Amino acid sequence: MYINDEDLAKLVAVQVAEMDKKNKVCDAKNDYSRRLDKITNGLNDAEGIKLNFKVYLTKEYNAFACPDGSVRVYSALMDILSDDELLGVIGHEIGHVALRHSKKAWRSALLRSAVSDAIASQSRTWACLSDSQLGDITSLALSAKHSRYHETQADEFGYIFLKRCNKNPWAMGLALTKLKKMLNQKDISKYAKLLEAFSSHPNFDERIEHIKQLAERDNYKAK
């Protein structure tokens, strides 16, 4: 079953809107929103996909980007990362969108779900799906683990992303170092979503070393 980009974007947009309703979204005057606006100022699109940013006020640590261009950052993550480190993480997530990894994850989630036959039998429209079915697809897509190659690509995208924003790209390595430290916490439950997304192979040490090599190659200070 083939799902075109337009239909997929519509599905994702609807599901992101549902997630926005279920989470506490910071309003425009909130300090977190103002900080994110400042950090992402001028970031309008990724490979032609229009971006939109919001902050979820929560004690959980996470950030994700979806194929429709929606980028969501959790306030707790903002508390532990510097502006440049956060921009690197955002760049990594946008990389998955720009490089079409996210689209593959959503398509895979649909095909893995029990509703693919139902969609195919109704001219591949989303109208036949229940809220719970759509929710299952969303959960599968957002929890999908990317391949080693895709994670490396996204890390490199985040690195280049920082360079294009005139930032020291080693901030990507510093962000990964902080995420690695989370694994050593006694209670990692509040980090679960973020670590699930970021701790897939290659491991943190390999990823940090790769970014360090890129930074040293480009004459940026890596410390």
Question: Each PLM stretch: what is its role?
Answer:
Residues M1-K223:
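A Zn2+-metalloprotease active-site environment signal
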